[in-house]
Amino acid sequence: MENQRRHIHYDGDKDKEFVLNSFRKCITEKREIDKFLEKLITPYIKTKDLKILDACCGIGYISYFLSELSSNSTFFGVDQTPYLIEEAKKLCSNKKNISFEVADIYDLPSRFPKKFDVSISWRTLSWLPYYDQMIKDLIAVTKDHIFLSSLFYDGDIDFEIKVREFQKETGKEHFNDYYNVYSFPRFQRFVYELGAKNIEAYDFEINTDLPKPQIDQMGSYTVKLEDGKRLQISGAVILTWKIIRIDL
């Protein structure tokens, strides 16, 4: 459990420019899944005065966009990677209702018990060794609602998927990422056992075409099916996204 609690996603400054450029694209080319979050979360935050946690916030682009929808709320973003928080502070330097801190989500319950009205964990769970401690800690710091996105399977099977990108600095030394797909029924049972009152799940189906990246690089692209729908794929992994709202 301690290894899981102290899982370090990025290895120092290795692949720093690649990581930063990937995040910056979320600002210049807003992703469809991020637009979907805005649609789902708007009724819960618009024109309200809330304390909102952006857990594992990266460069803070989710807070950057959502602060426009809820200008009276305060946003607090945390990430364990210093250069991402540095970039987040630059991005949101003109937004007085957003603050950032280098911190580990697993240390927050002791500092902020039931402090936040709403918490967001965006595109994080599938890139952890497992989700259980993360969910426990999000519930511990949240009063009302948690919004998250992850890869889920509708059957009672978990898939642990490790990725090693040999063209990256970290991939030269070891497996550098997870792309886990979790059993949604098991996830539901787990969250209800922690005291959640309600769970709503929304399948994300992309409506735009995404080009395939270089063959040696993970990255989302789409394949159009005969019925007009699109599969999202990264490497050899089908991205079965769900957006989850947990009501506490």
Spans of model-derived segments:
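Conserved glycine-rich SAM-binding loop
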Residues: G58
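A short glycine-rich, Lys/Arg-flanked "PGG" loop and its adjoining helix->strand segment in the class I
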Residues: D132-D144
